[in-house]
C-alpha cells in the first residue's frame, strides 16, 4: 500500500480552512489518492477535486476514493497548471485548499514500462501522461549535445553534463537509445571514477533531468503556483511537498512575492489593496521527522512549505473563506 508523505502535517495545516461548511480542496497531484483519502476521512463535509496527468493513477485513485465518498470526489485528467480551467469547468469560483505533492509517484517508479527507475532495465519513456509528448528516448536521440548538456546541468545539477551529453551523441550514432540499462552504463562510464563512488547511483541526476524535461515539470510548476493562489479564497491554504532543491527553490521564489507589500518599503502607510496577500505558515521548508523517514523512504527528501491567502488581488473582490463555491 502506498504511504503518502507527511499526511498528519498536511491535515493540520489545511484544517482551519477545510473545517468550514462547504469547503473544497484541490489535490493537484492526486496520484494513488493517499492524501485525498485522508482529507475525506478527516473532514466529513469537504469536497475533493483531484487532478492528475497520469491516467493509470486516476484509475487507481478513482476506485479508492469513490469507495470512500463518491458524492464528494471529482477526478479530472489534467496537468496541475490547469487548475483554473478545471475549476471553471466545475463551476467552482474559489476553493479553500490546494495541495501539491510533486515529483514522480510510487506507481510510476514501480511500473517498469514507464521507464522512471534507473535500477531496472525498461523502455526510456518517463512521460507522466503517456498519451502525449516526447519520451526520454526521443529526447536522448534527437537533442544536440548542447541542449542535452543544458538539461543535465540545469535540471539534474550534474557536474559532468557536457561529458555525458557528448557520450550520448556518440553512442546514439551507433544505435539509438531505447532502454534504461544502456543509459545507466553510459553515464557510469562517462564520469570520472572517483565521482562514481559518491552520492549513490551515478545515473540518478541524469534520470531526474530527463524526467523534468520530458514532463516540463518546472515550467508547469511555475505556472501552477500562481494559478493555485488565484484559485484560493481569502483564508484558503496552500501546501506544497517538494522532493528536490530545484522544486523547493521555485516554490519559495514564486510565492515570496505574494507575501510582500506592493509599495516601497519606505512608505509610512500601506494603502488598502497593497497589503501582503499571503502569509507563510511554515518557517522555511519543513522536512519529515526521523521516524517517518525510517518508515517511508520517499519521505527522506521531502520539503514542505505552506501559506495562507490573506487578501484579494488589488482592485478585485472575491469571497472569503466562508463563501465556498
UniProtKB/Swiss-Prot annotation:
Keyword rRNA processing: yes
A matching Pfam family: Methyltransf_5
Enzyme class, spelled out: transferase
One record GO biological process: rRNA base methylation
Primary localization class, coarse: cytoplasm
Role description: Specifically methylates the N4 position of cytidine in position 1402 (C1402) of 16S rRNA.
PANTHER family: 12S RRNA N4-METHYLCYTIDINE METHYLTRANSFERASE, S-ADENOSYL-METHYLTRANSFERASE MRAW
Stated family: Belongs to the methyltransferase superfamily. RsmH family.
The name this protein goes by in its record: Ribosomal RNA small subunit methyltransferase H
